[in-house]
Amino acid sequence: MTEPGTSVSAPVAFPQDRTCPYDPPTAYDPLREGRPLSRVSLYDGRSVWVVTGHAAARALLSDQRLSSDRTLPRFPATTERFEAVRTRRVALLGVDDPEHRTQRRMLVPSFTLKRAAALRPRIQETVDGLLDAMEAQGPPAELVSAFALPLPSMVICALLGVPYADHDFFESQSRRLLRGPGIAEVQDARAQLDDYLYALIDRKRKEPGDGLLDDLIQEQLNRGTVDRAELVSLATLLLIAGHETTANMISLGTFTLLRHPEQLAELRAEPGLMPAAVEELLRFLSIADGLLRVATEDIEVAGTTIRADEGVVFATSVINRDAAGFAEPDALDWHRSARHHVAFGFGIHQCLGQNLARAEMEIALGTLFERLPGLRLAAPADEIPFKPGDTIQGMLELPVTW
């Protein structure tokens, strides 16, 4: 079969930095104009498939002939620091069925819609406390450190049973792991987090608490369903994903709303639009841009053959701006049906914590703009730094006043 996805004349390098923090990189424009699959080149010169079409993405993310196991020899690496963790499997996200199914079943009860709803009063209390402190301090404020980051950190610590007093440590090690400049730093961050969680698990075995980590120790580790290494891998994933992604959505979501005054005014006038607004922001921002897979068999999709052992990258920011999936995709529209986006992935690896993330975002953004109706940027928008394209997207800092 022919490979029409190769129509892009010269492979675009992947990943690329965004020129605007809430839009896909302009360097991806040829991919947006092309077919659902094209070729891109990675940092090491390797050519892989990139998926940009919405329908093709949902089909492929549901296809178990694409593996998430990064220890496979031909699994794609988008950065050099990825090589630091390639040899070690990641719980849940980096395993395939049936192992993935077993791990997911352990965690599902703690992340249901009902469980997220039960946590809403605690989330609201945490949001109120953080905003009380901001108002008491007075403007200006740096919203990432004062609000966007501590909120999900506090929530995931309470859910897992991890002491929030340790947040400076695990937040800094998470940053090094996700954005460290080289292999040595990433490996050191991984080792530091491992040591911390092994010690915490050993302490909890002697003195159990009431968090999810305690439940996993009692119900899985002590019964031999998982070993300590697997539990540490699960805990690392939950701890990092539980604070890093939501913090970025809150900071970037706030910046985006402040840059779209008409949509913000509509949201303030109709607070009931907030759930739809959060869904649209998830689509519009697409902060996790670059899901990775490798084919274990030949796969035909959208007139293209992906060969066994070929790498596949999902350009989420482009997929969620596909005009075939979303009318006027570059518009921020609270009235569209956006729930079919792939910001949380799709298929068996779809984000386990999405219900909790939605609850945190709805409460955080709704309360922030209600409590601080005069909220505005405290620096020119084009001078506010945001994260590079090879990591989860978000604001590095967000100076605001009111």
UniProtKB/Swiss-Prot annotation:
Superkingdom of the organism of origin: Bacteria
Enzyme class: oxidoreductase
Disulfide cross-links: none
Region of interest: Disordered: 1-28
Keywords: Antibiotic biosynthesis, Heme, Iron, Metal-binding, Monooxygenase, Oxidoreductase
Signal sequence segment: none
Amino acids binding heme: C351
GO molecular function, one term: heme binding
Catalytic activity: 1-deoxypentalenate + reduced 2[4Fe-4S]-[ferredoxin] + O2 + 2 H(+) = pentalenate + oxidized 2[4Fe-4S]-[ferredoxin] + H2O
Magnesium found in the keyword field: no
Protein EC: 1.14.15.11
Cofactor(s) in the UniProt record: heme
One biological process term in Gene Ontology: lactone biosynthetic process
Family: Belongs to the cytochrome P450 family.
Additional detail: S.avermitilis does not produce pentalenolactone itself in vivo but instead a group of new metabolites that are neopentalenolactone derivatives.
Identification of the protein by name: Pentalenic acid synthase
Originating species: Streptomyces avermitilis (strain ATCC 31267 / DSM 46492 / JCM 5070 / NBRC 14893 / NCIMB 12804 / NRRL 8165 / MA-4680)
